[in-house]
Amino acid sequence: MVKTVNILGTEYKVIREPFADKDIDGCCDYTSREIRIRDDNVNEVGDFDELMRKQLRHEIIHAFLAESGLQANYEHYRQFGHDETLVDWFEIQFPKMIKAFESVNAL
């Protein structure tokens, strides 16, 4: 099933599918407006659903950066497109940040 997510006014398709490369769990293609997430637990991860939620957050952050005009404005843009450390940090910390924002009515 293909879902869509609105990223700063642009609709991105979220596609869950098996990947040929077992080392890739997801990708964001801002040129086709597609986010692809692995749907097969080929690596036999313990909590696969949690890993894929984290991966989806990670790819959505890439989409937000791209739609903000930051497709290639980071140190490693030739290899990755965005600084993966920054994207990982937001992906990991965002659930905690949203709770903090909600606790003080900051949304």
Placement of each model-derived feature along the sequence:
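Metalloprotease/metallohydrolase-associated module, dominated by Zn2+-dependent proteases
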Residues: M1-L51, E67-L107
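Active-site recognition of the HExxH zinc-binding catalytic motif
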Residues: K54-A66
